[in-house]
């Protein structure tokens, strides 16, 4: 009986230590959940989820967008995956999509209800993905800065989204 009690205490102590090292995801936690993009379905439909995975050690965003056929252009689907993680004290993210892109981001939360993902400096264009809390929903934007103007981000996509019920 004592050995069973000892095993239980060791397990409990290990579980408490694991819980203590799970990131709080402060500033990002409001994104966790299932979201549906709002807008004109004739332009496309989509949605995304943010979820804790690997015991809460990472956040994973899964995103999709379905675009209808337009003229000679066939319908298409865009899928992407982003893993958000801690690297020392820094929050980082890696993004992959169905078009073959891979983007490394630094992540910041400059204000409550605001998250910015800014791509690492590289020889090519830089990217900025932003989320802003708007009451129960959010506004999102994706911006691109050309190689010769590294901080001059221009809008590429913008959207609003609501939590799925």
Task: Specify the residue positions occupied by each region the protein language model found.
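Bacterial N-terminal signal peptides
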Residues: 3-15
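Hydrophobic alpha-helical segments and their boundary regions
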Residues: 2-3, 22
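Hydrophobic small-molecule pocket/channel-lining residues, especially in calycin-type beta-barrels
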Residues: 19-165
């Amino acid at each position: 009986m004592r050995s069973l009690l000892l095993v239980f205490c060791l397990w409990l102590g290990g579980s408490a230590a694991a819980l203590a090292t799970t990131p709080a995801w402060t500033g990002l936690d409001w994104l966790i959940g299932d979201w549906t993009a709002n807008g004109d379905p004739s332009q496309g439909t989509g949605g995304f989820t943010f979820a804790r995975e690997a015991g809460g050690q990472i956040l994973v965003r899964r995103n999709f967008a379905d675009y209808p056929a337009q003229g000679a252009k066939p319908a298409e689907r865009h899928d992407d995956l982003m893993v958000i993680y801690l690297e020392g004290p820094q929050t980082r993210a890696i993004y992959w999509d169905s078009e073959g892109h891979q983007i490394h981001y630094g992540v910041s939360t400059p204000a409550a209800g605001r998250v910015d993902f800014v791509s690492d400096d590289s020889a090519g264009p830089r990217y900025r993905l932003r989320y802003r809390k708007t009451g129960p929903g959010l506004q999102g934007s994706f911006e691109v800065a050309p190689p010769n103007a590294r901080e001059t981000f221009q809008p590429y996509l913008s959207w609003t989204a609501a939590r799925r019920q």
